């Protein structure tokens, strides 16, 4: 669909270009006065100047400054997300010296004054990043330390140059900026506010100090202020004020040209305010309806340079006409048209009057010089003199007048030349206009004979049968080149589409930012700190363990641990020794009872018994003796004897019972 629209627009523009090519613009004097006869040496070429130039001002013209936004800047307005937070540290220490430290950030709704004060501190370089206060742990108590901070996070938003509203995915609706004040906007999250960085309320795109400015020449078609107003500039050519409309862009009043370009008037105070008078008093310029501002693409425009070249070429042709005129050569209507200015205004106009004269020349042959008059035939001689004559055109008068030139258009498709005044449609070239304005003399040519008169600056007035008249204007106007390029400039203009805010999704065209906080998850808006999130996932045990190695009771706890460890080891050692001694006494007692039974001859069935005892030997050392008693032999046998280096407390015995 978009491609189809582009093709339709291109076809319309090309059709307009063809229409312009079928139309020719010429300059014709409409009011002449002060006719005088002058010498041919006094004929001068007109002062030609570029129609789009603002360096040459004629009577009734003024220059104003027009500006437009630069395409290098964006539509972002700098600002901050303002949040009020309490950074809190809670230390809980039990009576048994277990410490638990809890870190958390609590979100609080900030006030506008708090955000504005923090903004001032940040702009002055006094901004302090938030931090947790130092921990203060007290035995068998809960201590809470907190610091309140206003945090500012840089976050630019979009400012629509057409509606001058602020848009962002975090806003519930477009926000209106305040000029020369700090702008504060609400967001979906009631705990967060947006505050502007600057007080101008304008983004870089809409700051007129960075705009591109050009001089524009303004003039009326007539002295009457109610008549048509024209704007001329090297950048956008010639624009009729009746084809523009008022449109506000970036908060500034401006005009929208017929090719779609938007310009703002940046007046310096030295002008008469032609455009303001035209807008306010005449009410000729209406408000734009359903039109979008546009800007021209960065492209080199050669219209101004082409006109400069044409001016130099026209001036060279005019100098050639003066040379022929001063040399006494015949000046054709085309040569005379180069004396006509190529732009409207007050200039001289020239009309030449020629007459037919008869010239003769003597043809002298032999002996004819003796005769006093070569025109007399000397028939009595063989050789005679003679002469010949001919009819020629001779310049009789050069008439000059002061005229006001208007620009006329002519449709080339019509068989008869019809001219229409571009400034005043009421002016028509009819018989009255020809007789009163286009004063003429009979057109005389030395080769062709036809009815016609020659008027100002080579304008030819043809008449057939003395009734039907046709006006031929050989001069040209700079509008021929300007109007064609004016249509072509529409192809270089791009419309500026404004931003669209979707209230349901919070999204903005050209800015696909997904909202961070929505209405459906506002209940979790305070869960913003990482420490609280980690603690909820299992850091309680870690904090309890690390609490032992922190707080003011650290030294006391290590001392108690050391004393407790010493007493625990000593107690365990004593218990082991007591249990070992008690075990040895039981074994010795049981062995004695068994040995007594063996000595008195009591049978022990099929069980054999072994005994290990410690006995002193003759060398003053102790031997470890293992005795084996068997029921068959009824005897005790010494199996092994080991010599011990030392003896501990009491007799060491081991009893082993097994079946035989």
Curated annotation (Swiss-Prot):
This is Glycoprotein. Keywords: Glycoprotein, Host-virus interaction, Membrane, Signal, Transmembrane, Transmembrane helix, Viral attachment to host cell, Viral envelope protein, Virion, Virus entry into host cell. Pfam families: Rhabdo_glycop_CD, Rhabdo_glycop_FD. Belongs to the ephemerovirus glycoprotein family. GO terms for cellular component: membrane; viral envelope; virion membrane. It is a single-pass type I membrane protein. Disulfide bonds: none annotated. It comes from Adelaide River virus (ARV). Glycosylated by host. Glycosylation is crucial for glycoprotein export at the cell surface. Residues 580-660 are intravirion. Attaches the virus to host cellular receptor, inducing endocytosis of the virion. In the endosome, the acidic pH induces conformational changes in the glycoprotein trimer, which trigger fusion between virus and cell membrane. Residues 1-22 form the signal peptide. The chain crosses the membrane at residues 559-579. It comes from the Viruses.
């Amino acid at each position: 669909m978009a491609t189809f629209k582009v093709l339709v627009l291109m076809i319309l523009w090309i059709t307009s270009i063809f229409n312009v090519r079928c139309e020719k613009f010429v300059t014709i004097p409409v009011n002449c006065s002060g006719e005088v006869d002058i010498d041919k040496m006094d004929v001068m070429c007109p002062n030609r100047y570029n129609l789009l130039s603002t360096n040459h001002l004629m009577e009734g013209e003024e220059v104003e400054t027009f500006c437009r936004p630069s395409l290098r800047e964006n539509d972002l307005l700098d600002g901050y997300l303002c949040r009020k937070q309490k950074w809190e540290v809670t230390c809980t220490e039990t009576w048994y010296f277990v410490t638990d430290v809890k870190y958390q950030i609590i979100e609080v709704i900030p006030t506008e004054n708090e955000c504005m004060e923090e903004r001032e501190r940040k702009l002055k370089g006094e901004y302090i990043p938030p931090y947790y206060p130092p921990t203060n742990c007290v035995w068998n108590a809960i201590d809470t330390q907190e610091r309140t901070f206003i945090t500012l996070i840089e976050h630019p938003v979009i400012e629509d140059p057409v509606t001058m509203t602020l848009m962002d995915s975090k806003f519930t609706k477009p926000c209106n900026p305040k000029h020369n004040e700090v702008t504060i906007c609400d967001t979906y999250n009631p705990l967060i506010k947006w505050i502007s960085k600057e007080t101008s309320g304008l983004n870089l795109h809409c700051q007129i100090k960075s705009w591109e400015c050009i001089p524009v020449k303004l003039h009326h078609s007539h002295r009457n202020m109610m008549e048509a107003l024209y704007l001329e500039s090297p950048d956008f050519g010639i624009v009729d004020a009746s084809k523009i409309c008022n449109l506000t862009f970036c908060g500034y009043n401006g005009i929208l040209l017929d090719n779609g370009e938007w310009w703002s008037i940046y007046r310096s105070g030295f002008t008469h305010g032609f455009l303001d008078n035209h807008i306010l008093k005449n009410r000729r310029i209406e408000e734009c309806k359903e039109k979008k501002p546009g800007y021209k693409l960065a492209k080199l425009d050669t219209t101004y340079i082409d006109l400069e070249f044409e001016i130099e070429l026209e001036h060279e042709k005019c100098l050639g006409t003066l040379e022929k005129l001063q040399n006494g050569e015949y000046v054709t209507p085309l040569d005379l048209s180069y004396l006509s200015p190529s732009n409207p205004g007050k200039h001289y106009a020239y009309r030449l009057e020629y007459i037919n004269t008869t010239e003769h020349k003597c043809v002298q042959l032999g002996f004819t010089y003796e005769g006093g008059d070569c025109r007399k035939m000397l028939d009595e001689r063989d050789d005679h003199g003679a002469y010949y004559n001919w009819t020629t055109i001779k310049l009789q008068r050069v008439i000059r007048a002061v005229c006001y030139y208007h620009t006329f258009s002519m449709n080339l498709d019509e068989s008869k030349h019809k001219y229409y005044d571009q400034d005043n449609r009421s002016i028509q070239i009819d018989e009255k206009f020809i007789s009163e304005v286009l004063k003429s003399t009979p057109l005389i040519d030395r080769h062709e004979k036809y009815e016609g008169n020659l008027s100002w600056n080579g304008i030819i007035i043809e008449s057939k049968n003395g009734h039907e008249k046709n006006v031929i204007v050989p001069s040209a106007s700079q509008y021929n080149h300007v109007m064609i390029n004016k249509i072509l400039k529409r192809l270089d203009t791009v419309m500026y589409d404004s931003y669209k805010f979707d209230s349901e999704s919070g999204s903005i065209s050209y800015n696909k930012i997904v909202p961070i906080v929505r209405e459906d998850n506002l209940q979790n808006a305070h869960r913003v700190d990482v420490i609280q999130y980690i603690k909820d996932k299992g850091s309680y045990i870690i904090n309890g363990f690390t609490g032992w190695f922190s707080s003011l009771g650290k030294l006391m706890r290590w001392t108690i641990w050391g004393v407790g460890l010493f007493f625990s080891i000593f107690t365990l050692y004593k218990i082991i020794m007591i249990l070992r001694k008690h075990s040895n006494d039981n074994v010795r007692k049981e062995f004695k009872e068994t040995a007594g039974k063996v000595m008195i001859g009591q049978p022990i069935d099929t069980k054999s018994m072994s005994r290990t005892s410690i006995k002193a030997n003759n060398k003053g050392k102790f031997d470890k003796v293992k005795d084996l008693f068997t029921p068959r032999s009824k005897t005790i046998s010494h199996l092994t004897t080991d010599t011990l280096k030392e003896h501990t407390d009491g007799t060491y015995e081991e009893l082993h019972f097994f079946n035989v």
